[in-house]
Structure formats: structure tokens, C-alpha cells
């Protein structure tokens, strides 16, 4: 990290990685189901 000519070029961090896919395949249904369960608490029978 001593050479300062790659300030706008981070080392090798692309946005769409396997980690990104793994996080979002877990996080998106989790948020969806939490919202659905939370909204089901307020449905009157």
C-alpha cells in the first residue's frame, strides 16, 4: 500500500462476486419473509 498510483483502482474488488451472490440470495428472502411475518401480526381475523 505504499505506491499511491492506484487510488481509484482498489486491489481486486469487483462488485458482483460470489460473496455478493451468496449474501443477496440469503438477505433478500430474509428481508421479504421478515416483512411478511411482521405484517401478518397486524391482520385481524
UniProtKB/Swiss-Prot annotation:
Asked if the keyword S-adenosyl-L-methionine belongs to this entry, the reply reads no
Annotated heme binding sites: 24
What's a single GO BP term from this record? photosynthetic electron transport chain
Q: Which cofactor does it need?
A: heme b
Cellular location of this protein?
Answer: Cellular thylakoid membrane
Q: How does it assemble?
A: Heterodimer of an alpha subunit and a beta subunit. PSII is composed of 1 copy each of membrane proteins PsbA, PsbB, PsbC, PsbD, PsbE, PsbF, PsbH, PsbI, PsbJ, PsbK, PsbL, PsbM, PsbT, PsbX, PsbY, PsbZ, Psb30/Ycf12, peripheral proteins PsbO, CyanoQ (PsbQ), PsbU, PsbV and a large number of cofactors. It forms dimeric complexes.
Please report which protein family the annotation says this sequence is part of.
Belongs to the PsbE/PsbF family.
| Protein's job | This b-type cytochrome is tightly associated with the reaction center of photosystem II (PSII). PSII is a light-driven water:plastoquinone oxidoreductase that uses light energy to abstract electrons from H(2)O, generating O(2) and a proton gradient subsequently used for ATP formation. It consists of a core antenna complex that captures photons, and an electron transfer chain that converts photonic excitation into a charge separation.
Listed name of the protein: Cytochrome b559 subunit beta
What species is given as this protein's source? Trichormus variabilis (strain ATCC 29413 / PCC 7937) (Anabaena variabilis)
The encoding gene is: psbF
Amino acid at each position: 500500500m505504499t505506491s499511491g498510483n492506484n487510488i481509484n483502482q482498489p486491489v481486486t474488488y469487483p462488485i458482483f462476486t460470489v460473496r455478493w451472490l451468496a449474501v443477496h440470495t440469503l438477505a433478500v428472502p430474509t428481508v421479504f419473509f421478515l416483512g411478511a411475518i411482521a405484517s401478518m401480526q397486524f391482520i385481524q381475523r
